[in-house]
Amino acid sequence: MAEQKLLVKREGDFHYPIYLKNDFQDLVGAIREEGLENRKICIVTDSHVAPLYHEAVKSALQEISSEIFSFVFEAGEKNKNLNTVQELYKTLIENEMDRKGLLVALGGGVVGDLTGFGASTYLRGIDFIQVPTTLLAQVDSSVGGKTGVDFLQYKNMVGAFHQPRLVYMNMSTLQSLPNREFTCGMGEILKTGLICDEEFFRFVCKNQPEISKLDLSMLSRMIRRCCEIKAGVVERDPKEQGERALLNLGHTVGHAVEKLKNFQLLHGQCVGVGLIAAAYLSMQRGLLTGEEYEEIRKGCHSYNLPLSVDSLNAGDVLAATKKDKKMEAGHIKFILMDGIGKSFIDKTVTDEELLQAIREILV
């Protein structure tokens, strides 16, 4: 597999590289290239990732820093909150971290979101880098500068835009990924194709056997394309004033389900269910054919994404969508599909339309 590097750049605003590698050997070189050496470093990770990769990363970083400490919190979405951020602040203060310090987010989406938010707010903003170790984090959450934590069980309700200084992906970490976490990442990958790349969506569906076997060549191609799409959107619309909202396809219903299931389902699994609801609503409006709707269902099913959820009430799901942070002037900014690989923002979705789509994914 050819190792690769992409650049995320917006003139006069930000620029940073995305490295796609097979190990951690070049992490130090990447940090040096960005001029981030000789700083105090805090590695932020969780209880799942720390036993796997913390020592390898810390050992590598000792080449460029004589002051390294760590903050390890209990893994899980339930700990992506302000209480954990406060504990991070305490650790940074106790270790006399100053504005020249560097946070290293080592882990999945929860670690990246929380670390980024901590970096954006500590001393009014310090540098951080993303070292994502899950498929979802590599293809989605580590790129783009969205940071945040959950509040009162509302997903990412408190957050800030704060771009990382670099993103370093060691794709061999996916070999240790539990099947459920792999499935979670595939929800975001299928979403990416449905938004703007029909050919990519069909590539992912067609090559499911090789991708599910974690073929590094296939994974590299798939992850790179997702990063290219995400980087392009972020460069054009970094703060979600327009086009970037398309990346929320499947997320309105998905976030509602995630909250009501008390985060028992992983984010990408809920996005998968949300994709089915969005596809159904699009079909009901005549934007998707019945065949395209079934193709989307089949693609999700092939990667073991849930097509429905149980023990929920349609009215409760609808009410939860009303508290979504993507509301604008009392209207939901719902993302619909106009065929596979084409999407648009719609503010005219009625409660009855949404209820019909929600009922489609409830059992």
Model-assigned labels for residue ranges:
Residues V110-F117, Q138-V139, A256:
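Short glycine/serine/threonine-rich phosphate/pyrophosphate-binding segments
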Residues E11, F117-E210:
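A glycine/threonine-rich phosphate-anchoring loop and its flanking beta-alpha core
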Residues Y89-L106, T115-Q130:
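Non-catalytic interfacial helical region
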Residues A2-L6, G187-I189, L287-V363:
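C-terminal charged capping/lid subdomain of soluble metabolic enzymes
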